[in-house]
């Protein structure tokens, strides 16, 4: 497609179509013109012009006054001298660079048009009869040049409607390109494309309002300006208005002023007078307008200017840019485009554009550029400001500037970001600071409890000052976080003791060590610094917190909560030389992992305490007596190995979560736990003795974990809370669950390695159950009735050695995805006629007594049976029609697959080791198949017709000793990357009329009957032919231009090696060791010792199973300094080797 930039404003037409009326006027062309018209694209039509042999002057003028010509080549196009003369004129404009041209091929082959052959060529030759030679040459030149341009071949599109829309969008993008000045904003085209889709510009009747929403500095206004510039030519009446906050009590005057500004802009009348409301609606009711309102923060501004879409004419578009999502909701703007932060890759491109004027930074700047992008959190404003400030500086200057960039905010960035903060009310400003200084990354539910705020968080999220993730976490952009902390720091005037929040280690150390804290301090969060230093992290005196009477949030050691740190003595990082005698009474959050104290101060009353988190501590007990714990909602003392007792919980009536897991010294739970009637989560795995009678009052308990725990008493388990959603009890000592337990809320049951013999009697209401883990329960004889387990997705029973069968009710588990029954030694049979269409994984490995496997309807991506081949019967009706989407079926006695085998959904077929003579008759639909493994199928005499396996990437036929050749249908495997046929000793030849365009690896090693050098792909990179009967390396080996590795050692029959092998510039290794029959090889050739720097890539499977130890291990030893690996988008692993030596080894 031509890329002319010539588009003078004097052009009358956007598009000139050249076409054969008899072919397309009433069909394709009419639809295309309608689509262009919907996009406000002015298309010339030849109504009223009488066609003749001589092109009319009106048409010549129209062609010259069009910005784009669309030439529709069809069957009869070349039959018209009129069309051909039009084409000549279009060709002239194109060659002068005055016009863009888009060729469209409607039912004709582009090459036929280009070469004037085929049916199109026959028609053209007939038209050329009796025509002057110079005229014919002009036609030929025009046809050849125009058809060579990038265009659209309608034969390749899914539907004609799709292609019409595609062409119309292409024309629109070329007519209305991205304006100059926005090129540095990498990715802006994608934003504009998405917004234009929402605007539905092809609809001429609709009046549409769209919101563009996102945080400050993310590029909303830039995107809006670029979009406005691109759309402006399609709207005669248009206006771009930026909201400016005003103060004053004259609300009416302010509204009239807004209306005047909009109308003056849109009508082009500077002296317009407005003395009453509603003039916007009156003046613009019948006008098609484009209005963009930027930086809107006032609902009245919207109501005044764009109160309703009906105020404007058909086809109008209103775009509102704001940081406040609630404002859009209030104005009932439902179509909202959220501008999200760019990806890391895009951010790096942006910083590179601003700093270096190109898409990627120089190699020695990459790390620095990446750090700058991280410092500004990929915020486009930050990328622009810092990138521009670093432009033209050398690396040393970048390095010198980094400390300042890490610690200080740029004034321009801070000024922009502060606008959103300044617009908040006083209460929400405080909330903003709390999150910036302390609660960034916390759960929303947790912050609501600690700050006693609900509405404010929603407000901050709507104003893009925080983001609430789908998992319920609060995320604040790091530049906003830095802004909030700077605001708190500024109020203290350099005195850390007067700040509300202390998060800097040096500030905390000064305040805590010197005991200078004041009542201003609300929160202290000790950062995880100096973890591995020899000196203590923090020295805390016995009364360090005494002056901080209003301290509510104390977090010490919020580093990773894994047990590793206890191994290296993290407790020593906090030094309490006199212990601790005081903790502020108003504490709501006390998080002190690895606390070295044996107990908390006796003066601490915990009246306001909401969260107590002290994992991996040295606590032996928390406190003496009963404390007023009415506010406490979470207590987490997990992995506190010295903890011998937990306090009286009589007054902890609001406690919702209690974690005592792995408290190895804790023997039992106190009876007072029954008072925690709101307890929803109880983790006490490893607590030695549990009286589960204490659970009887916990009617709200949903999550119970008692792994490794014994049960008090000998009467068995008599009660489990009814509302349990998750029960985790590995190594459970009971024989069955209580008969009165109703599992209607149960989502996950995990009782691995238990002593269970059965779960319960009868049928339970298991509609909520999704996961059941009973593996390793060697006494389990039966699993319960699953009739009502309609949502069960995972059932793990492997190692259940006493299990004999599955209940027929499993057929009701139609959503079952995973069924694992490995090593069920006594399993004898499955229920008949199973319908498990959702099943993706079925494993029956190690089930030696399973003697029949009846019909099963499922959709597997993995299926494995690995038992003794003499102990399984498989009937011809083994598979129903809707077979697994993937199949791994080993050691089967069938001579061929069942006649009803339908593998259309199959992605991975592994029947290695089977006794098949052939897989199936005829052609199967294998469009989904990506990998096929028939290895070690010694009876296999032919592989199936693979004509339709167009997506197959890997084919393994190793050890198929009865295979003599491959069918020519493998030529359809255009995506095949690897073909392995090692030790196919019966293989004599491969097809010679195929070229597998994607094949990189071909392994025929050990094919001792193969006499002919394989030439089935010109893209081969690795060719393994050792121990074959090949007699000659032919001269056409030079066609294998990508060949990097050729192994042919021990080819005893090899007699001739063509010198053309030296023309292979990519060849790095050629091994002809022990080829004793060579009579003409390289006797007069000079061995190449080294080659220029280059890269060779050999793809390996995800499991690195094709390691080719005989070669790669040797290379690695020699080149280990320069080998690295990576995975491509399909998961293929690549070894990349630099500076490899070429080895030509002969004896």
From Swiss-Prot:
LRR repeat ranges, renumbered to this chain: 548-573, 584-606, 608-629, 630-653, 655-676, 698-721, 722-743, 744-766, 767-790, 792-813, 814-836, 837-860, 926-950, 952-973, 974-996, 997-1017, 1018-1042, 1044-1064
Enzyme class label: hydrolase
GO molecular-function term, one example from the UniProt record: LRR domain binding
TIR domain sequence ranges: 11-175
Disulfide bonds: none
EC number, UniProt record: 3.2.2.6
UniProt cross-references to SMART domains, sorted A to Z: TIR (SM00255)
A Pfam family the protein falls into: LRR_3
PROSITE patterns: TIR
Effect listed in the UniProt record for changing residue 389 to F: In the gain-of-function mutants chs2-1 and chs2-2; seedling lethality when grown at temperatures below 12 degrees Celsius. Dwarf plants with chlorotic leaves when grown between 16 and 18 degrees Celsius
Gene Ontology annotations of biological process type: defense response; defense response to fungus; signal transduction
Domain notes: The TIR domain mediates NAD(+) hydrolase (NADase) activity. Self-association of TIR domains is required for NADase activity.
Role description: TIR-NB-LRR receptor-like protein that confers resistance to the pathogen Hyaloperonospora arabidopsis isolates Emoy2 and Emwa1 (downy mildew disease). Plays a role in the regulation of temperature response during plant growth and survival.
UniProt name for this protein: Disease resistance protein RPP4
Species of the source: Arabidopsis thaliana
Lineage of the organism: Eukaryota, Viridiplantae, Streptophyta, Embryophyta, Tracheophyta
Gene name in the database record: RPP4
């Amino acid at each position: 497609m031509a890329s002319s930039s010539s588009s003078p404003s004097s052009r009358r037409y956007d598009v000139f179509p050249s076409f054969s009326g008899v072919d397309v006027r009433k069909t394709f062309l009419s639809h295309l013109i309608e689509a262009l018209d919907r996009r406000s694209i002015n298309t010339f039509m030849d109504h009223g012009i009488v066609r003749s042999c001589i092109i009319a002057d009106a048409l010549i003028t129209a062609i010259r006054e069009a910005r784009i010509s669309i030439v529709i080549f069809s069957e009869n196009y070349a039959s018209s001298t009129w069309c051909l003369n039009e084409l000549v004129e279009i060709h002239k404009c194109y060659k002068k660079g005055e016009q863009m041209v888009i060729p469209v091929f409607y039912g004709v082959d582009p090459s036929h048009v280009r070469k004037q052959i085929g049916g199109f060529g026959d028609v053209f030759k007939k038209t050329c009869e009796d025509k002057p030679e110079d005229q014919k040459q002009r036609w030929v030149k025009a046809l050849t040049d125009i058809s060579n341009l990038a265009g659209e071949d309608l034969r390749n599109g899914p539907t004609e409607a799709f292609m019409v829309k595609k062409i119309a969008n292409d024309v629109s993008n070329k007519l209305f390109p991205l304006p100059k000045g926005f090129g540095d904003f990498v990715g802006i085209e994608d934003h504009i494309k998405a917004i234009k889709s929402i605007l539905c510009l092809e609809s001429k009747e609709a009046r549409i309002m769209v919101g563009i929403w996102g945080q400050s500095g993310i590029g909303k206004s830039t995107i809006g300006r670029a979009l406005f510039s691109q759309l402006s030519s399609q709207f005669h009446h248009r206006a771009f208005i930026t909201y400016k906050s005003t103060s004053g009590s004259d609300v009416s005057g302010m509204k009239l002023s807004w209306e005047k500004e909009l109308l003056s802009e849109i009508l082009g009348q500077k002296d317009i007078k407005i003395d009453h409301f509603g003039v916007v609606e009156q003046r613009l009711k019948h006008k098609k307008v484009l209005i963009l309102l930027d930086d809107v923060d006032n609902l009245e501004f919207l109501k005044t200017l764009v109160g309703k879409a009906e105020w404007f004419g058909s086809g109008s578009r209103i775009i509102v840019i704001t940081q406040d999502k609630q404002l859009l909701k209030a104005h009932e703007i439902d179509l909202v485009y959220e501008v999200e932060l760019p990806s890391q890759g895009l951010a790096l491109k942006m910083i590179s554009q601003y700093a270096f004027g190109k898409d990627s930074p120089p190699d020695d700047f990459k790390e620095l550029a990446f750090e700058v992008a991280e410092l500004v959190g990929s915020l486009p404003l930050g990328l622009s400001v810092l990138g521009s400030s670093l432009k033209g500086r050398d690396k040393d200057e970048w390095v010198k500037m980094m400390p300042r960039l890490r610690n200080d905010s740029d004034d321009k960035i801070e000024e922009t970001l502060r606008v959103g903060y300044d617009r908040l009310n006083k209460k929400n400003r405080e909330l903003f600071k709390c999150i910036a200084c302390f609660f960034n990354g916390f759960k929303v539910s947790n912050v609501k409890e600690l700050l006693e705020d609900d509405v404010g968080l929603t407000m901050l999220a709507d104003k893009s000052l925080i983001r609430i993730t789908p998992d319920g976490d609060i995320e604040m952009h790091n530049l906003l976080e830095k802004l909030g902390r700077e605001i708190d720091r500024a109020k203290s005037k350099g005195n850390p003791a007067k700040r509300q929040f202390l998060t800097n280690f040096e500030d905390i150390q000064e305040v805590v060590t010197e005991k200078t804290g004041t009542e201003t301090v609300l929160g202290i969060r000790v950062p995880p610094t100096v973890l591995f230093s020899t000196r203590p992290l923090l020295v805390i005196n016995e009364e360090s917190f005494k002056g901080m009477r209003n301290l509510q949030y104390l977090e010490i050691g919020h580093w990773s909560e894994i047990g590793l740190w206890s191994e290296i003595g993290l407790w020593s990082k906090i030094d309490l030389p006199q212990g601790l005698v005081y903790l502020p009474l108003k504490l709501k959050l006390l998080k002190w992992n690895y606390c070295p104290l044996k107990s908390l101060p006796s003066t601490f009353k915990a009246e306001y305490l909401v969260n107590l988190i002290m994992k991996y501590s040295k606590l032996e007990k928390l406190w003496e007596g009963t404390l007023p714990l009415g506010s406490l909602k979470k207590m987490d003392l997990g992995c506190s190995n010295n903890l011998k007792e937990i306090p009286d919980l009589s007054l902890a009536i609001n406690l919702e979560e209690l974690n005592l897991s792995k408290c190895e010294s804790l023997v039992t739970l106190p009876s007072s736990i029954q008072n925690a009637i709101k307890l929803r989560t109880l983790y006490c795995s490893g607590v030695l003795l549990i009286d589960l009678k204490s659970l009887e009052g916990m009617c709200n308990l949903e999550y119970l974990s008692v792994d490794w725990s014994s049960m008090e008493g000998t009467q068995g388990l008599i009660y489990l809370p009814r509302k349990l959603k998750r029960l985790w009890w590995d190594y459970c000592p009971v024989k069955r669950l209580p008969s009165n337990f109703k599992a209607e809320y149960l989502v996950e049951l995990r009782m691995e390695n238990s002593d269970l013999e059965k779960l319960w009697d009868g049928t339970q209401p298991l509609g909520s159950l999704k996961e059941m883990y009973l593996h390793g329960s060697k006494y389990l004889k039966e699993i319960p009735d699953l009739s009502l387990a309609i949502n069960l997705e995972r059932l793990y029973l492997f190692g259940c050695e006493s299990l004999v069968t599955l209940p027929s009710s499993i057929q009701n588990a139609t959503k079952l995805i995973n069924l694992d029954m490995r090593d069920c030694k006594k399993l004898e049979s499955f229920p008949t006629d199973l319908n498990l269409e959702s099943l993706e994984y079925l494993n029956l490995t190690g089930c030696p007594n399973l003697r029949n496997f009846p019909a099963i309807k499922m959709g597997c991506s993995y299926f494995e049976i690995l038992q003794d081949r003499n102990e399984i019967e498989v009937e011809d009706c083994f598979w129903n029609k809707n077979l697994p989407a993937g199949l791994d079926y080993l050691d089967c006695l069938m001579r061929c697959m069942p006649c009803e085998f339908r593998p259309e959904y199959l992605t991975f077929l592994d029947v290695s080791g089977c006794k098949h003579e052939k897989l199936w008759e005829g052609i199967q639909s294998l469009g989904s198949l990506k990998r096929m493994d028939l290895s070690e199928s010694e009876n296999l005499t032919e592989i199936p017709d693979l004509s339709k396996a167009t997506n197959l990437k890997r084919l393994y036929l190793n050890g198929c000793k009865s295979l003599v050749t491959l069918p020519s249908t493998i030529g359809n495997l255009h995506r095949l990357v690897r073909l392995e046929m090692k030790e196919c000793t019966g293989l004599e030849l491969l097809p010679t009329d195929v070229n597998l365009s994607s094949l990189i690896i071909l392994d025929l090693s050990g094919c001792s009957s193969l006499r002919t050098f394989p030439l089935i792909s010109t893209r081969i990179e690795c060719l393994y032919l050792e121990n074959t009967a090949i007699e000659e390396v032919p001269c056409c080996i030079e066609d294998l231009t990508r060949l990097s590795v050729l192994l042919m050692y021990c080819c005893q029959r090899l007699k001739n090696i063509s010198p053309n092998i030296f023309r292979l510039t990519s060849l790095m290794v050629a091994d002809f060791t022990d080829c004793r029959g060579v009579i003409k090889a390289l006797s007069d050739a000079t061995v190449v010792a080294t080659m220029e720097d280059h890269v060779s890539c050999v793809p390996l499977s995800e499991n690195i199973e094709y390691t080719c130890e005989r070669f790669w291990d040797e290379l690695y030893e020699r080149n280990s300094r320069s080998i690295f690996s990576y995975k491509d988008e399909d998961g293929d692993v690549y070894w990349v080797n630099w500076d490899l030596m070429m080895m030509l080894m002969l004896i």
